[in-house]
Amino acid sequence: MSSRLGAVPATSGPTTFKQQRSTRIVGAKNRTQCSIKDNSFQYTIPHDDSLSGSSSASSCEPVSDFPASFRKSTYWMKMRRIKPAATSHVEGSGGVSAKGKRKPRQEEDEDYREFPQKKHKLYGRKQRPKTQPNPKSQARRIRKEPPVYAAGSLEEQWYLEIVDKGSVSCPTCQAVGRKTIEGLKKHMENCKQEMFTCHHCGKQLRSLAGMKYHVMANHNSLPILKAGDEIDEPTERERLRTVLKRLGKLRCMRESCSSSFTSIMGYLYHVRKCGKGAAELEKMTLKCHHCGKPYRSKAGLAYHLRSEHGPISFFPESGQPECLKEMNLESKSGGRVQRRSAKIAVYHLQELASAELAKEWPKRKVLQDLVPDDRKLKYTRPGLPTFSQEVLHKWKTDIKKYHRIQCPNQGCEAVYSSVSGLKAHLGSCTLGNFVAGKYKCLLCQKEFVSESGVKYHINSVHAEDWFVVNPTTTKSFEKLMKIKQRQQEEEKRRQQHRSRRSLRRRQQPGIELPETELSLRVGKDQRRNEELVVSASCKEPEQEPVPAQFQKVKPPKTNHKRGRK
């Protein structure tokens, strides 16, 4: 029988020494290879010449007469994690040794208990010991049942608000929120103690920011006003200016009002009317002494007087309305009240300015009295054609569809994007049936085709009369204008009268003049003579005549040129 690795077949009869030697070598090789395959780590020993009389029956089976291998010590095998070889083998060609099977988990655990370091070297990582479950974490996972409160109680309302919004605010201060009813109750026990109290006046405030603002606004190193004391306006304005500079805004001090302002005037205007009824507010209204129009603020009344009635006129104290008295007493930017002498000086300056303005009226045009719009210009516009509602509706529909309208007159190619533009065009279109009028100048009755033409005519030809005096100007200014016109008319009349009288005198020289006129003429002649004397005295003194011997003799002029005979 031949082996799997090509062993030499056994022969009958006597064998030589060489044959026995080769047989022993081949058998040893076969046994070594078989032991490597089975992972037994067994070492084979050669057979003795005397004992081996025949060839091995099989390459993988040991000789039955003598043990073919010996085992290492058990300690050495355990140190290298090697299991000792099994004593029995599975017979047959397809049999597999049980040595190659993996050890059960129980044996590995036992080996690990005996040699933990070796276990760590083999597996390459440290195995963590199993942790036991924490009983506290399991207890926390247990969901608590929702608390039950009495129906309609405050606790139930707070609980519903927490479920809805996530927190509930303190009903006392409305500034602190809690997520649980127990926390809210604990806060409410000390809620009154947590409020900030001003050590100046004892006022309780909800937050630290509110306390800081209160101290800054009311106790800013200034004397505190008590009941019955009058407010010093310059001091109050200075205090408000400091608060506004530091905090950036002024808040109303009333508890029910949360208004804030960024200007001192707005704050003072609000404080005067905050918390007052309609009857009190009506008494505080200021009325214009010209037209009686009511205003809620002095600034509004002052603007009305400047825009509608010109500059504010200064009246004596007896005839001045109360509202204007209050306005005149209003403090200026420096905090000083205007004195009476200053008011009188301003009044005289205003009169002088009005007189100068009246003198320069033809040269200078005041901004209010210039003609910025067409209603003040002295010209008339022609009438525009009328259109039916159906035509207008059709034009509007065309604009929505095509975004343009064409002139309906035949031969006209004008296109417009609005109904008003088409209307203005039809008023001046020459291809239509409508005969448009012309623009007429009311100063000289001249007609123009276009509006720009009549405007240019008025601005250039009637430069002094092109504006209309504003009827709402001040009465004092109108009086000055009338007085100036009367003076100019009187001067013109006097000049005309003088010119007529001088002409009459020239035409009638033989008529004797009355004594009054003679005296006037004599006085005039005397004045003329005196003026002549004064002018003569003012002139340089005449030079004395020089004797003839000292005078230079000038050669007579000749018509001959030099160098010619």
From Swiss-Prot:
<dbReference type="InterPro" id="IPR036236">
    <property type="entry name" value="Znf_C2H2_sf"/>
</dbReference>
<comment type="function">
    <text>May be involved in transcriptional regulation.</text>
</comment>
<dbReference type="Pfam" id="PF21367">
    <property type="entry name" value="ZNF512_zf-C2H2"/>
</dbReference>
<feature type="compositionally biased region" description="Basic and acidic residues">
    <location>
        <begin position="522"/>
        <end position="531"/>
    </location>
</feature>
<keyword id="KW-0677">Repeat</keyword>
<comment type="similarity">
    <text>Belongs to the krueppel C2H2-type zinc-finger protein family.</text>
</comment>
<feature type="region of interest" description="Disordered">
    <location>
        <begin position="1"/>
        <end position="30"/>
    </location>
</feature>
<feature type="compositionally biased region" description="Basic residues">
    <location>
        <begin position="494"/>
        <end position="507"/>
    </location>
</feature>
<feature type="cross-link" description="Glycyl lysine isopeptide (Lys-Gly) (interchain with G-Cter in SUMO2)">
    <location>
        <position position="332"/>
    </location>
</feature>
<feature type="cross-link" description="Glycyl lysine isopeptide (Lys-Gly) (interchain with G-Cter in SUMO2)">
    <location>
        <position position="83"/>
    </location>
</feature>
<feature type="cross-link" description="Glycyl lysine isopeptide (Lys-Gly) (interchain with G-Cter in SUMO2)">
    <location>
        <position position="18"/>
    </location>
</feature>
<keyword id="KW-0805">Transcription regulation</keyword>
<feature type="compositionally biased region" description="Basic residues">
    <location>
        <begin position="554"/>
        <end position="565"/>
    </location>
</feature>
<dbReference type="InterPro" id="IPR013087">
    <property type="entry name" value="Znf_C2H2_type"/>
</dbReference>
<feature type="zinc finger region" description="C2H2-type 2">
    <location>
        <begin position="286"/>
        <end position="309"/>
    </location>
</feature>
<feature type="zinc finger region" description="C2H2-type 4">
    <location>
        <begin position="439"/>
        <end position="462"/>
    </location>
</feature>
<dbReference type="GO" id="GO:0008270">
    <property type="term" value="F:zinc ion binding"/>
</dbReference>
<keyword id="KW-0804">Transcription</keyword>
<dbReference type="GO" id="GO:0005634">
    <property type="term" value="C:nucleus"/>
</dbReference>
<dbReference type="InterPro" id="IPR048408">
    <property type="entry name" value="ZNF512_C2HC"/>
</dbReference>
<keyword id="KW-0863">Zinc-finger</keyword>
<dbReference type="Pfam" id="PF21276">
    <property type="entry name" value="ZNF512_C2HC"/>
</dbReference>
<keyword id="KW-0862">Zinc</keyword>
<dbReference type="Pfam" id="PF00096">
    <property type="entry name" value="zf-C2H2"/>
</dbReference>
<dbReference type="InterPro" id="IPR048403">
    <property type="entry name" value="ZNF512_znf-C2H2"/>
</dbReference>
<feature type="compositionally biased region" description="Basic residues">
    <location>
        <begin position="118"/>
        <end position="129"/>
    </location>
</feature>
<keyword id="KW-0539">Nucleus</keyword>
<keyword id="KW-0238">DNA-binding</keyword>
<feature type="zinc finger region" description="C2H2-type 3; atypical">
    <location>
        <begin position="405"/>
        <end position="429"/>
    </location>
</feature>
<feature type="compositionally biased region" description="Basic and acidic residues">
    <location>
        <begin position="484"/>
        <end position="493"/>
    </location>
</feature>
<feature type="region of interest" description="Disordered">
    <location>
        <begin position="484"/>
        <end position="565"/>
    </location>
</feature>
<feature type="compositionally biased region" description="Polar residues">
    <location>
        <begin position="12"/>
        <end position="23"/>
    </location>
</feature>
<feature type="cross-link" description="Glycyl lysine isopeptide (Lys-Gly) (interchain with G-Cter in SUMO2)">
    <location>
        <position position="226"/>
    </location>
</feature>
<keyword id="KW-0479">Metal-binding</keyword>
<keyword id="KW-0832">Ubl conjugation</keyword>
<dbReference type="GO" id="GO:0003677">
    <property type="term" value="F:DNA binding"/>
</dbReference>
<dbReference type="InterPro" id="IPR052274">
    <property type="entry name" value="Krueppel_C2H2_Zn-finger"/>
</dbReference>
<keyword id="KW-1017">Isopeptide bond</keyword>
<protein>
    <recommendedName>
        <fullName>Zinc finger protein 512</fullName>
    </recommendedName>
</protein>
<feature type="zinc finger region" description="C2H2-type 1">
    <location>
        <begin position="196"/>
        <end position="219"/>
    </location>
</feature>
<feature type="region of interest" description="Disordered">
    <location>
        <begin position="85"/>
        <end position="147"/>
    </location>
</feature>
